[in-house]
UniProtKB/Swiss-Prot annotation:
4Fe-4S as UniProt keyword: no
Family: Belongs to the RuvC family.
Note on how the cofactor is bound: Binds 2 Mg(2+) ion per subunit.
Name the record gives this protein: Crossover junction endodeoxyribonuclease RuvC
Active site, UniProt feature: D7, E67, D140
Subunit structure: Homodimer which binds Holliday junction (HJ) DNA. The HJ becomes 2-fold symmetrical on binding to RuvC with unstacked arms; it has a different conformation from HJ DNA in complex with RuvA. In the full resolvosome a probable DNA-RuvA(4)-RuvB(12)-RuvC(2) complex forms which resolves the HJ.
UniProt keyword Magnesium present: yes
CDD domains assigned to the protein according to its UniProt record, in alphabetical order: RuvC (cd16962)
């Protein structure tokens, strides 16, 4: 299964594509779609959609995962993000891809074992688990990778989910994972 995680934003949108194979997870591609900052919101949204079209056509995901919308105190920012999310969803739906959404806490929990982890902790854990090497990725990119990882780890579209449905491959919990994989810990 190949999942595209998207962290939408009007100035830059992070994306991460992860494939789940019998050998584990492998990053197929990740990066930022950056519209021209001087352009209007409508022009930036159009550029964002074109960039996501390219990512989808090149990396061929089978599903898309997004973080659920967070609404803070700034109404204007929430409205802009709503427009961006709508455009992202329309772009994805044009490619007939299923979409799943996850709460930020659920994403952090699936990556780090705690729902209160900061973005830097999520990035560090993903760097180890997905073998991203020493290269630091922008937080928008690691957020997108975390969203895709969460989808696969939760079994929404994964081999692991199929095993759980068959009653095999039950999780032994976070502590057992840490004990079995000390090389992934700092």
């Amino acid at each position: 299964m190949i999942v595209l995680g998207i962290d939408p934003g009007s100035r830059k949108t992070g994306y991460g594509v992860i494939a789940e194979t019998a050998a584990g997870y492998r990053v197929l591609g990740c990066g930022l779609v950056r519209p021209r900052a001087a352009d209007t919101l409508h022009e930036r949204i159009s550029q964002l959609c074109a960039g996501l079209d390219e990512v989808i056509e090149q990396l061929k995901p089978e599903a898309v995962a997004l973080e659920t919308a967070f609404v803070g105190r700034n109404v204007r920012s929430a409205l802009i993000l709503g427009q961006v999310r709508g455009a992202v969803l329309a772009t994805v739906m044009r490619h007939s891809l299923p979409v799943r959404e996850y709460a930020p806490r659920e994403i952090k929990l699936s990556v780090t074992g705690t729902g209160s982890a900061c973005k830097e902790q999520v990035a560090a854990m993903l760097s180890r688990m997905l073998e991203l090497g020493g290269e630091l990725k922008p937080l928008d990119v690691t957020d997108a990778l975390g969203i895709a990882y969460c989808d696969l780890a939760r079994g929404a579209s994964s081999l692991g989910g199929q095993l759980r449905k068959n009653g095999k491959g039950r999780s032994k919990g976070w502590a057992a994972f840490v004990n079995e994989h000390p090389e992934l810990m700092a």
